[in-house]
Amino acid sequence: LQNTTVNVGKQGLTTPWTVAVDSDGNEQTGTGILALTTVGPVTFAGAYFNQTNLDTSAVDVNGTTTGTGFDGSTSIATIGVIGTAGPVTLDAWYLDMDDTFDSYTAGAKSTFDVSGIKLGADARFASLTTDAAGSKANTMGKLVLTADAGLVDGKIAYAMTDKDGGLTALDADASTTLLGWNLNALNKADADYWQA
C-alpha cells in the first residue's frame, strides 16, 4: 500500500500511554508489529505486541513503579487515528492489555505564531478501566499552554483526575498524564494539579 509503514520485531511502544525513547533508558519496548498508513491528512495506526518489558519498566495497575503488576508476555493491541485540521493535530487511541485493562484517549495539539511569539496548546482526556470485577474507570483531563518569545518562555498546565483514580498511563512521562519536577498526576484520585 502507498504511504504505509510496517515495523516488525522489537521496537519502542509508540503509544500515548508509554514512552518509546527515553534518554535515561526507561523506555517501554515490545516485540510485535506496528503499521501506519496515511490517507490525505489522516494517519491510521494499528499495533500488536505479544511480549513487552512492561514487567520492569512501567507503572503497574496498582500505581506502583515497576515490576509488580504486569506479565511481560501479556499481549497488547492498540489502534489510533491521527489527523490535522489547519494548525491543529487531533488524535484518538484505544489500547487493550489482555486480561488487564482497556483504555482510550483523545487529544488536540496546536502551535502558532502571534507577532513573533510561539504559542502552543495541548489538551488531552484519558480513561482506563482494569479488567477486575467491579472496576471503575480512572480518568484524567489536562490542558497545557505554552509561550516562547526568544530568550523568555513560559508554561502553565492543569490536570484533573476523577474520584475513582488517575491511573491513566504506563509511564509518568507518557502523554496520558501530566509530569512536573518530582510531581505528577498519575494514579492520584480526585486531584487538581497545577504547574507553572
Predicted regions and their residues:
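Outer membrane beta-barrel
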Residues: L1-V61, S75-T89, L145-D164
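Extracellular loop and loop/strand-boundary signature of outer-membrane beta-barrel proteins
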Residues: T18-V21, V61-T68, W181-A185
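Flexible, surface-exposed loop regions and adjacent strand-edge segments
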Residues: G25-N26, V61-T66, D171-T176
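Active-site glycine-rich loop that binds ribose-phosphate moieties when present
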Residues: T66-G67, G72-A77
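Outer-membrane beta-barrel pore domains
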Residues: D71, G86-T89, Y94-A196
